């Protein structure tokens, strides 16, 4: 079975390494952790970095697998997984997401609103150096070594891609919730209760609407899949076998 894990903002596929190490070599051999276009390398020609472009990119990754896949997403990766699974349930064997969801009542966090504002977003990005970003990631629950690694990839093309992505998503709560009833039933939500960006109530409402199991983690932040990699791995293995 093929598994695709999708990172979020402002991350790289390296954020999945603690989970991959825990899952073991047999599972990891059939696991793909692609970088979002524009994050690890310059934006491909013709790719506009909107939320719809990233969903199309993920669906193309799923189609290339040649069989239904297990999808796993965190942060923006979670939003993309839910949307892609809603649009193409025929390509999905199972899905699991953490610490971000398209939910009707959710309002974007403060940093997102800044990024969505022309000029202010560019200024904020310019003032966010790599050291500041590393400290911010660590404060939100990411291990310091990984936070430093992720911050080292804080490039001009990543910053531009992030601004375009967020500005395309001002109305995501309305635009991406109408098809949730099409989600495959084999889903799982994993959550860090102390997430400063997306409150656990968002997960509770989403899971109640979609009848999806919610696994909460006390004293865990936004990067729950890193902080609790062994626990998440155990849940995923059972989820895939069910």
Where do the model's predicted regions map?
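Conserved HGGG/HGGXW glycine-rich cap/lid loop of the alpha/beta-hydrolase fold
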Residues: 1-43
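Gly/Ala-rich beta-loop-alpha elbow adjacent to hydrolase catalytic centers
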Residues: 73, 77, 81
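Flexible "cap/lid" loop of the alpha/beta hydrolase fold
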Residues: 86, 94-123
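Conserved alpha/beta-hydrolase catalytic His-Asp/Glu region
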Residues: 106, 127-181
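Conserved serine/cysteine hydrolase catalytic core
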Residues: 158-207, 216, 225
């Amino acid at each position: 079975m093929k598994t695709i894990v999708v990172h979020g903002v402002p991350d790289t596929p390296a954020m999945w390494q603690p989970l991959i190490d825990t899952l073991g070599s047999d599972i990891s051999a059939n696991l793909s952790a692609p970088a979002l276009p524009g994050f690890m390398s310059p934006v491909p020609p013709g790719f506009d970095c909107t939320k719809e472009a990233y969903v199309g990119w993920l669906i193309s990754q799923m189609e290339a697998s040649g069989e239904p896949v297990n999808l796993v997403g965190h942060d923006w990766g979670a939003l993309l997984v839910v949307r892609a699974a809603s649009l193409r349930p025929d390509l999905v064997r199972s899905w699991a997401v953490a610490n971000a969801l398209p939910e009707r009542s959710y309002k974007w966090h403060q940093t997102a609103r800044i990024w969505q504002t022309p000029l202010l977003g560019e200024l904020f990005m310019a003032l966010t150096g790599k050291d500041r970003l590393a400290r911010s990631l660590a404060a939100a629950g990411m291990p310091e070594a990984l936070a430093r690694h992720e911050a080292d990839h804080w490039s001009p093309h990543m910053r531009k891609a992030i601004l375009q992505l967020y500005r395309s998503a001002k109305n995501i709560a309305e635009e991406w919730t109408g098809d949730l009833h099409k989600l495959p039933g084999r889903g799982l939500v994993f959550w860090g209760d102390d997430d400063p960006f997306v409150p656990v109530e968002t997960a509770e409402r989403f899971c109640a609407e979609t009848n999806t199991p919610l696994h909460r983690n006390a004293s865990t932040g936004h990067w729950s899949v890193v902080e609790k990699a062994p626990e998440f791995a155990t849940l995923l293995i059972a989820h895939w076998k069910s």
